[in-house]
Amino acid sequence: MKSIAVTGYKNFELGIFKKDADEAVYIKETIKRHLIPLIEDGLEWVIISGQLGIELWAGEVVALLKEEYPIKLAVLEPFEKQSANWNENNQLWAQEVIGAADYHAFITKRPYESPAQFAARDGFIIDNTDGALLVYDLEKEGSPKFFYDRAKLAKEQANYFLECIDFYALQDVVEDMNQTF
């Protein structure tokens, strides 16, 4: 597997409103623990669309992993000016991650017009990656459901790699990181 998409909940879907909230430490560690074995098995590219939350945290993780591993980050935004209506802190966060990317492009080369651009993003990313890592719990639906449904279909039809990190996996990392010896 050479390329993988990483996506999941937006931060506010998880009740997290700051990029550096305590919970983000655990989320980023969980993503890191799932990416490292894939990188060691030959993963070359991590693809995100630059959404707030899981995707930008994944971008931060990949930026750090690039110091030790031969991994690259691509940010494929669904449309131009995706972050235009975000607050200043979130815009800066997105710019930091895009600045660390090895590749940045827009799937549709125009500003937001309709939800169809999100569907186009999902289809394009699934069609151009070998798999996906989702921070998504089937027991708590949210915005990742649309990507999950398409990726699940790709898995069934075309042997697409699909791994979901659920809340139990996140809790395992929290407990592991907080263990005292």
Swiss-Prot record:
Domain of life assignment: Bacteria
Record-linked SUPFAM superfamilies: MCP/YpsA-like (SSF102405)
InterPro entries per the UniProt record, alphabetical: YspA
UniProt record similarity statement: Belongs to the UPF0398 family.
Organism of this sequence: Listeria innocua serovar 6a (strain ATCC BAA-680 / CLIP 11262)
Protein name per Swiss-Prot or TrEMBL: UPF0398 protein lin2003
